[in-house]
Structure formats: structure tokens, C-alpha cells
Amino acid sequence: MVLMILPFVGPVSVSESLVAIITMCLVYMILKFFRTEIPEGLCQLPGPKPLPIIGNVLEVGRNPYLSLTAMSKRYGDVFQIQIGMRPVVVLSGSETVRQALIKQGDDFAGRPDLYSFRFINDGKSLAFSTDQAGVWRARRKLAYSALRSFSTLEGTTPEYSCALEEHVSKEAEYLVKQLNTVMETDGSFDPFRHIVVSVANVICGMCFGRRYDHNNQELLNLVNLSDEFGQVVASGNPADFIPILQYLPSTSMKKFVSINDRFNAFVQKIVSEHYTTFDKDNIRDITDSLIDHCEDRKLDENSNVQMSDEKVVGIVNDLFGAGFDTISTALSWSVMYLVAYPEIQERLYQEMKESVGLDRTPCLSDKPKLPFLEAFILEIFRHSSFLPFTIPHCSSKDTSLNGYFIPKDTCVFINQWQINHDPELWKDPSSFNPDRFLNTDGTELNKLEGEKMMVFGLGKRRCIGEVIARNEVFLFLAILVQNLRFHAKPGEPLDMTPEYGLTMKHKRCHLRAAMRSRNEE
């Protein structure tokens, strides 16, 4: 989310500043003069009164998920704020969001034309692109087909049901050994530091068919790039909401463009290598699967949209970026919750011991045997809401929602955090309670409750990698719970306060872990 527009602009002269201010004032007055007329029978959107030029940015503050949730209590599930000079509609409430993204999915399937979006994946990103026409739909379908093909790809040995299970299981087992080694040498570990490298390795294996040593510089460069991307996006780009600022120098924007260029170059190099060694009869990873689907499309005379080779680079870029940050953040929060609630950690271990045993590695087929673990994961998604907003949507035409008129090309924020903490949906939403996702006797997941939780978006822009992400989090966590007991480092209080960003992360800290004995009760 790009919700902060406080000045992150490089040095400019006094005359340039005056010209920018005068121009913005003129544009603001023109926009006020040409206000959109409200069709008969519809109401004007409610919301706080904006200040000239900066809009409601001061009221939104540095924790938008909290301030916008508070505003929804005052103005309702559909209201409007102004960020800079751009009107933004904020949607809250499960029924309202489902109405917008599912029942009126075509009306809200767009992406706003934000300046920074043009530089993500050279403006061709599946997730951020403003396009929603035939080419975008074809690329999304191609990406989904490649993911599905890869998810059913056989592992190298019969003990793994698929390639995904093999990649995750091997990396999770290595992570257990790594944490045990670090504990012996250092006495504590940074959960995010080790988890993020492990997840990056899984994504590299899935997308590129290669695994790195945890100290490999190329792998660490990827991790650092992702971290830099998150930091720059979290700080915000004022030009997204005050367009005139895109013509002024900006240090943060230069850094943002550089990060995207470096990552694009990395992916381009690996995809080029895959084209050179591609064998249709030996699909090694998601990149091969994408190339295979592209080749089939080129041979299909009935295909309306042909896929160029550069589209493969773009899709791989998207899949890598999306899967990497989301999964590593989810797993890092998982370990924090294990430490914060030791009685829940022990209950998870007992379920693992009784239902799966300690003599083999948990697998995806064990999911039905581990309902409390599944409920624990759902409650982490809900309680942390580490993805507080979806990527901004945009109205693709003049439309209405809950009786309010929403003009075409209006930027729309979906407040997932509010939905996941809505007291009308959840009993005592501020408490961490995995049992809320189980049936009355605690033996099965309550699927209806699980469907209320929102973290991967909804509708036409829903995350296409959701199933893979959920499976990866499950496997990683199952293997960690089976083998390690996590606890806090003495003298270092556990701080669960989220730090706002594209994904909300906990504060960096050090924890302890101990290998569990196979004879442990």
C-alpha cells in the first residue's frame, strides 16, 4: 500500500517549490470547480473534509489500517478520503467488500494508474498493472496454468507427493538443522533473518530449479532487494497522489526504480538460461512450465493472444516477488506466536505427536490429521493481518455501492485488517484464539469460519498463488513444530507490535530454540 505522502522529495530550489505549490493550488481549485455530478437516486460518499493539496493525509497517519478502521465506525463501510489530490474510496465490512469484489467484480477489477506502478516489472506486472483486458487475462491464465502444472509435478523420489512438497520439506529440514547450529554457536537467533533466506531458497527452487547455500551472495542479494523494496514502498511515493511531484527529483523514487531494474535483470538472466536449456520432456520448474505453455500457445492458431518471451520474465518476476515476502512474513509471525503462547505451542506438538508421529516428516496429506495446526495458521492470518490492505483497486466504470456513487477511475482501498477484526464477525477479535476456526468438538476445521478471514484478496484480482502459499506455510510450520521448541530470550521482552508496510512485520528480535527429544512426553 502506498498511503504515506509526507515529503520524500529530493532537494529543490525555492522557485521550483513555488511553481509546484502554485500549480497544485490551481489544479485543486479546478478539480473542486468540476466536481462530478451525483446521479439521481444515489448519495454522495461520506468522509472527512480534506485539506487543500494534502487531503486527509494527516488524519490517515502512519498506521492507516487503524485510522481507516476508526473512520469506518464513523462513516460506514463505504466512505471517501483524499490522499494528496487523489480521491480514494475505502471499503470495509465483509458483506460490502464481497459485494464489490465478487458480485460487482467487473466494476472494481481495475488498478489505479499510480506513478510508482509503472516501474514495477516495467509496468507489465500482473499484480500492479492497470490493464484488465484480454492480454492481462491471458497472462494471468498462463501464470495460473503454470502454477497448477508445477504443483502437480512429481517429486524426485516417491516419498514426496509433488515437487512443491519436496522443495519445502528439504528446506524446512535444513532450517531446523541451521537453527540448532546457530543456537549452539550464538545462543539465540533472529527468526526473520533465517526464515526469509529459507523461503527465498524455496522460491528459487520452484521458479528457477536451483537451491543456494544460505550464505550464497546471490541469494543474500535477492533477500536484500526484497527488503529494500518493502522499505521504499512503505515510506510511500508522494507522486502517486500529487502527480506534479513526479517531475521533481526524488531520492526514494530513484531507489525504487533501481531496485526494480536490478531484480528484472536478475530474472531476465535466469529465464534466458532456461530458454537455452529448455526440454519439453523434462519440466524442471515454474519457468520451464511457463515456457512450455507459451510454446503451446504459439502453436495454437486459435489463440487470440500470443505470449512473447518477455512476458515469461514478467510473470516469473511477479510470482517470485509475491510468494517470497508474503510467505516469509507469515512464517516469521508464526514463530512469534508460538513463543507468545507456549501452551498453544505445546498443544500443536501433542497433536503432531499423536496424529503424525515423530518418526517421519509431515506431508501435505497430513492436513486433515492436524486441524489445530490449520486453525493456528488461520488465526495467525486473521490476528496479525500482516497484509492489512490489498493492492489498491480501481473502479473500471461509473458504478454504485451501498447506494453511493463511485465515479470511473476512482482509487479503492480494501481494508482487510478491519474485516479480520470486526466484532460483528468475530467474538473477541483482539484475542488470539485458534479454536474459533474449529468445530464444537475440536476435531475438524470450521470451513465457514475460515472463509470469513481475508488475507489474499477476493474476486478477479485474488492472489493466484494462494494455494501454494497456504501449503508452504503449513509444511514449514509442521516441520518446525515437530522438531523444535521455541521460547523467548531472557531479558528481551517479546514485542508483537506490527510495523506498517506493504506487509506488516514484527520488530526484529532474537529468540531461542531447542531440539525436541524423540522420547519427549
UniProtKB/Swiss-Prot annotation:
This chain's function reads: Cytochromes P450 are a group of heme-thiolate monooxygenases. They oxidize a variety of structurally unrelated compounds, including steroids, fatty acids, and xenobiotics.
Q: Where does heme bind?
A: C463
Pfam families reported for this sequence? p450 (PF00067)
Q: How does it sit in the membrane?
A: Peripheral membrane protein
**Which keywords accompany this UniProt record?**
Endoplasmic reticulum, Heme, Iron, Membrane, Metal-binding, Microsome, Monooxygenase, Oxidoreductase
Q: Which domain of life is it from?
A: Eukaryota
Q: What name does the UniProt record give this protein?
A: Cytochrome P450 1A1
Q: Which gene encodes it?
A: cyp1a1
Entry cofactors: heme
Where found in the cell? Endoplasmic reticulum membrane; Microsome membrane
Any idea of its EC number?
1.14.14.1
GO biological process terms on file: cellular response to xenobiotic stimulus; hormone biosynthetic process; progesterone metabolic process
Q: Which reaction does it catalyse?
A: an organic molecule + reduced [NADPH--hemoprotein reductase] + O2 = an alcohol + oxidized [NADPH--hemoprotein reductase] + H2O + H(+)
Its family remark reads: Belongs to the cytochrome P450 family.
Q: Which GO terms describe its cellular component?
A: endoplasmic reticulum membrane
The UniProt annotation places substrate binding at: F229
One GO MF term, please?
Answer: steroid 17-alpha-monooxygenase activity
